[in-house]
Amino acid sequence: MKKQNPWIYLNEEEKNQILNFSESYKKFISKFKTEREVTAYALDKAKKLGFINAEEKKNLMPGDKIFYTCREKSVAFAIIGKNPIEDGMNFIVSHTDSPRLDAKPSPISEENELTFIKTNYYGGIKKYQWLSTPLSIRGVVFLKNGEKVEINIGDNENDPVFVIPDILPHLDRKIQRNKKSDEIVEGENLKILIGSLPIETKEKNKVKLATLQLIKEKYKIEEEDFVSSEIEIVPAGTAKDVGFDKALIGAYGQDDKICVFTSLESIFDLEETPNKTAICFLVDKEEIGSTGSTGLDSRYLEYFVSDMIFKIKKSEYNNLHVQKALWNSKSISADVCAAINPLFSSVHDEQNAPQLGYGIPIMKYTGHGGKSMASDADAELVSYIRQLLNKNNIAWQVATLGKVEEGGGGTVAKFLAGYGIRTIDMGPAVISMHSPMEITSKFDLYNAYLAYKAFYRE
């Protein structure tokens, strides 16, 4: 199948639309880096656009705009459609979490008169990429009286940053240089440097005590309070244009916040009530297998769909309505895929691999080796998506996750398919996925928005 770079066929108005949309996205991904922050942003914007908490509604009718929140980390937005709900819904599901470092429950330690935060990495990171990189600390801490304290340090102009110190090349020959990439630094040594000045005291660990004193003075947080906290360490800094032509975006967390942003904007921008109920579901925990009560494996989707249908059907409601509605639904698993990286192109089947700037990739399946753990979209669904994109003049390309037996991975698709929902993976291509600086195309970003909006409209 012949590939052509679509950018050269755009007129100036189309190029400006892409560039303006990209600036909004860059502001979003620079500011909101954790699942709690993304969820709060989405809720705030939705409320301003007229979305109402579904728990406060007793009845639902076509055109109603509602949301369901799951423990401040996942959220679903829905616009009730004109068609009977049992005829199916259109889901777009993306995830709010990204690979990062999480503070341990008792994280503050002192070594050689330096204070550190001990961490446990979250998701599939290359550990060595996080060494000597400016980091910010974000999250929530619940004090012993139950008060919630929010933390966001490292991205404001006058904030300090934090760092995991690497070994200098003059002394790394035995300890690091000849090791495999996943052994360059042990997970236990991913410790964040946070302090170096001591306090005047006869007690041991003078630097740790000084750091804890500063934390208590500013945030009222005591050492024991970290037990009831969610502290996430993420790269500091803002999204940047990449290249002289500024056609690419470099930023942390584009997996999967590029799909979060585009799926949100597409449902928020719907001008008319859709035929089928449109649902934008932002979920947590995808990077560690969609586990936990805020992940897609928690059955929260089944809960809010059941509640929604009950408020539509009222006395006519029965469980079969829920099963029919799910079985007749379609879903886009809105997650990024691996673009060809010319420096490591040997891992790709280039005929079936996406390129930056060629439109939104359609990924029929993911998985490992013999499609293990994959959700393999049926040809009928792929045909539907293909016709939809072509009809709306949206640029698209095919995608697979590398050569057979080269590696592999998965998305939320298999969990959606577990409900009987016909599901396909469709999200922008990324270079340097799971790194502190992921790279995407502005053209692909905008075409993802157009594709998701067209899907909701049908």
Swiss-Prot record:
User: Which coenzyme or cofactor does it need?
Assistant: Zn(2+)
Protease listed as a keyword: yes
Q: Name one GO biological process term.
A: proteolysis
Q: Which family does it belong to?
A: Belongs to the peptidase M18 family.
Which Pfam families does this one have?
A: Peptidase_M18
| Classification via Gene3D superfamilies | Aminopeptidase i, Domain 2 (2.30.250.10), Zn peptidases (3.40.630.10)
NCBIfam families in UniProt: PRK02256.1
Q: What is its EC number?
A: 3.4.11.-
Against CDD domains, the record matches this protein to: M18_API
Q: What domain of life does the native source organism fall in?
A: Bacteria
Instruction: Give binding positions for Zn(2+).
Output: 95, 170, 434
- Protein's recorded name: Probable M18 family aminopeptidase 1
Q: Which GO terms describe its molecular function?
A: aminopeptidase activity; metallopeptidase activity; zinc ion binding
Recorded GO cellular component terms are: cytosol; membrane
Keywords in alphabetical order, please: Aminopeptidase, Hydrolase, Metal-binding, Metalloprotease, Protease, Zinc
